[in-house]
Amino acid sequence: MASSNPLRRSSPRRKATSVAVTAAAAAAIVTPQQSAGFVPSPVTSRYFSKGANTSKASRSSRLFSERDKEVTTSSTKKPKVERTHSFQPVWHGSMVKKSGDSEVADVHTLVLGTHPSIASLSKSEMFGHTQNAFWWMAGDCLGFRRQLGLNAEGKPYKLTQYLRYDESHVLSYEDQLQLFTSKGFALWDIIKSCERKGSLDADIKNEEPNEIWDFCKSHKTVKRIVLANGGTGCTMFNRHFRDWWLSGELKPGSNAESKKAFDKFAKKTDNFRDAKIEVISALSVSPAAAKYSYEEKRQFWEDYVYGPGLKDHEELQKR
């Protein structure tokens, strides 16, 4: 009598039939390669039939996954910000060949920007932004006018109503530099090169300072350094010239802004008896510094920069 046990072993004939059906079903599957006209060779068929396709597909999938990851990473990575570089220092000695002057004015005041803005670099002009107050104030204090002061629509900037000189006193940029330096003033920047997206001092990264200490060693008549752009510039000056402060050669200016910015860095000897140069934190000339009006900024610069500087120039000429 035949056994009714469901766990009984399959007969060889039934097993062979099952294998044949499975093979037929597999043969009926049309792969994408076959639909595109690719007919696998016997070797390829044998390779796939043994299950090696699983590891092959896995490796391929992992490879493409890594490539996709690389593409995604490179496409989302922020573009590198190019380094920008400051101008060379400008003083009367650097202008003499252009002007034909026979005598060189000694430098008594070195005015430092932080680093040229996009507008300055594109125009190759220090303090080149049209609404930067620097050249407007220099003109008011030294007897010239920067330009007409009109915007793209032909309307005058607000600050032009406070200017001391009319259109007949407008000078070109080169002539402004010539007059400015002939009075013993010099221009440079704190930062020689840096990475910065935009023009804000706060966005400066990986900076390298200019050789300002060496400049002053070469110009022993320098009596004051003026930081033209406020707080961030002062912070960078302190960071890069801490040893200069510790040497005792520098002292804070007499205004409140300078004392606040520099007192803790200065070497306090007997009333700064060894100090040769005062460092002034000035009201910022930047158009972004809107806390003070143009008139307030000009008054500060006249009291602490141009007034004392012109007196020093007269004294130096008498030597």
Give the positions of each predicted feature:
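Internal catalytic-core helix/loop-beta-alpha segment
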Residues: 182-243
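Short, surface-exposed acidic-centric catalytic microdomains
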Residues: 120-205
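C-terminal capping/extension of enzyme domains
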Residues: 2-21, 31, 38-106, 129-130, ...
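Short, conserved, surface-exposed binding loops centered on an aromatic residue
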Residues: 102-103, 176-180, 218
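Intrinsically disordered, low-complexity regions enriched in glycine and serine
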Residues: 23-27
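Glycine-rich His-Gly loop
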Residues: 112-117, 284
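Internal, well-ordered interaction modules that form the hydrophobic cores of assembly/scaffold domains
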Residues: 114, 127-130, 137-143, 219-233
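Short, hydrophobic/glycine-enriched beta-strand segments
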Residues: 104-114
